[in-house]
């Protein structure tokens, strides 16, 4: 699992393709399979790049990065039950009533009458991980201060490794 932050081309308000090129190089040169792409959305991320977002106001805030899950095999171990989220109020109501509007959808998917009648203990999460990285006094910062070490300005939100450790082990 790798997260490569977004990159902007120097001196212009355009995205660099370097993160995508890096992904493809890892995949092709190492013989890896791209299992799934995730989006890490940080609602607390500061506006940037400053020149294009705040000063010239020709771009919007860059608030997400891609996380790529790669593997040496097309079928690596994973279990989405380990990262199930609480059911929504509507899903809980549906499970208790046992009634669902079954039939063919505009998408041409056919939903059976019992499709959503099984309580699986939680909802399958999406591939968008929303996590602010606003911790100002965690053990990392405490230890850095204690040992007079510089604090890295772009630390990963703890929710990211926690999700993948639970999902993939």
Q: What are these regions, as identified by a protein language model?
A:
Residues 1-169:
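Core catalytic lobe of class I
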């Amino acid at each position: 699992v790798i997260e490569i932050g977004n990159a902007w081309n120097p001196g212009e308000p355009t995205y660099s393709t370097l993160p995508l090129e890096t992904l493809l190089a890892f995949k092709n040169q190492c013989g890896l399979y791209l299992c799934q792409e995730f989006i890490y959305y940080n609602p607390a991320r500061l506006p940037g790049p400053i020149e294009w977002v705040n000063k010239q106001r020709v771009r919007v805030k860059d608030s997400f990065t891609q996380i790529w899950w790669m593997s040496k095999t097309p079928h690596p171990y994973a279990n989405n039950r380990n990262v199930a989220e609480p059911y929504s109020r509507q899903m809980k109501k549906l499970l208790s009533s046992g009634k669902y509007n079954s039939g063919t959808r505009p998408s041409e998917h056919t939903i059976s009458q019992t499709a959503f009648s099984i309580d699986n203990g939680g909802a399958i999460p999406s591939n968008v991980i929303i996590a602010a990285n606003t911790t100002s006094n965690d053990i990392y910062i405490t230890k850095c201060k204690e040992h007079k070490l510089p604090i890295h300005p772009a630390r990963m939100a703890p929710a990211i490794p926690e999700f993948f450790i639970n999902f993939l082990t």
